[in-house]
Amino acid sequence: MRNYILVASGAVIGVTLRYGCMLVISEQLVLLFVNIVGSFTMGILNAYFEHRAHAELQLLLTTGLLGSFTTFSAFSAEWLDYMMHSPLVAMGYALVMTFSCIAAAFVGYVIMKRGERA
């Protein structure tokens, strides 16, 4: 039961942060922003937790907070909307989102690893 509470608590924080971003960032960019920031942060946290046993903190931050801050379902819905109007735009959107998020996660991971060595 404790794990459910940790994930739910993180999720409340994450979705609140995402909603805050939705209020101040243009509708066209907000999902790209939250997914890139979330991926970057996930890279940092993955590197941090790699050799540390903090299962509860990891659940709170990764599954709960970042899982609700980032959003694959909204990305999929936006992609479908773009696809119905312009398949070329949809393809570009999918490529930019996917590669940007992967790159952000990688950069976050590398930065954290380099910081640990310093």
Where do the language-model regions lie?
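Membrane-interface helix-loop junctions in multi-pass transporters/channels
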Residues: 1-118
